[in-house]
Amino acid sequence: MDLFSVRMRAQKNGKHVSGAERIVKKEELETAVKELLNRPKEFDFMNVKVEKVKDFEVVKFNLKISTYSFKSPEEAREFAVKKLTQEGIKEEVAKKAVEILSKGANPKGGNMRGAVLMDIETGERLEEDKERGVRTIHFDWKDRKKVTEKLLKEGYTLRTVDALALTFKNLFCGVVAELCWSDDPDYVTGYVSGKEIGYVRITPLKEKGDPLGGRVYFVSRKELSEIIECLTQKVVLIEL
């Protein structure tokens, strides 16, 4: 079976605004490209890349999903830190991750295109390029239509469909835990994840209207090169 990776990234005024990937059969290419073309709300630059997949691994999804709501971002962030400590992340390291996303992870101000890689022991940022970060690519659901229908029926959103796949690949590649909330000013739900705590949706992790957001991957320094290689090179299809 021939599979193709379809990746889209879009920018506006030089800033990353949208990105997504689908891994599909040849006969599904046109549909996938059209879907990704319509994904960004606004942009002045878009790049769509189609690549034939050489090797891939099918992995069974095994994360539990939970949802928690709070009265304020402060309460929600405290809970996020608590859940991360349950995954073995030191409290001060988890708090540092929250602070980085709340202030804007890009050292020059604003958001990063990719994720922060944070040392689980020291809280030090390990990504080589601290403006771009590291992006998780080359992953999708084996049967995206089936997964989407199931999750929507259970009350989840399309965002959750994509986020679950992304964070599952992260954990598969050796990321110990993840903290994420969107840079979309209108979307205030985020999550933490780990093999023990599962995928934990938390709202609101920021105030409505706040344009800052991003991802922090908590990683072991000694496994850094292997993790980055897996995140950026290995093709993973996830089976629900």
Swiss-Prot record:
Role summary: Catalyzes the transformation of pimelate into pimeloyl-CoA with concomitant hydrolysis of ATP to AMP.
Keywords for this protein: ATP-binding, Biotin biosynthesis, Ligase, Magnesium, Nucleotide-binding
Gene: bioW
Pathway: Metabolic intermediate metabolism; pimeloyl-CoA biosynthesis; pimeloyl-CoA from pimelate: step 1/1
GO molecular function: 6-carboxyhexanoate-CoA ligase activity; ATP binding; magnesium ion binding
Record-linked NCBIfam families: bioW (TIGR01204), PRK01322.1 (NF002360)
Cofactors required: Mg(2+)
Superkingdom of the organism of origin: Bacteria
Record-given protein name: 6-carboxyhexanoate--CoA ligase
InterPro entries registered for this protein in UniProt: BioW
A Gene Ontology BP annotation from the UniProt entry: biotin biosynthetic process
EC number of this enzyme: 6.2.1.14
